[in-house]
Amino acid sequence: MAKIIIPTPLRKFTSNQAAVAVQSGTVIESIRDLTLQFPDLDKHLFNEDQQLRGFVRVFIGEDDIEDLQGHDTPVQQGDTISII
């Protein structure tokens, strides 16, 4: 499992959890797992076309996924994903 750090404004949708355990795979799969656990997050992270909203930035550790493989960046067991 990996974990996603939840930004403070979105914690009200995760029962005030600062971090949530998610399945590993790719970044997009991990974020989808998060929204399956907390469906109210979906509209805040994804647009009508089910693409991540343009203002959502995602990091694995300190690396911006846009500098890696984007949404298809592999997520390993124990990785920390941050949503900004």
Language model: regions and residue ranges:
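Ubiquitin-like/PB1-type beta-grasp interaction modules and other compact soluble beta-rich domains
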Residues: 1-84
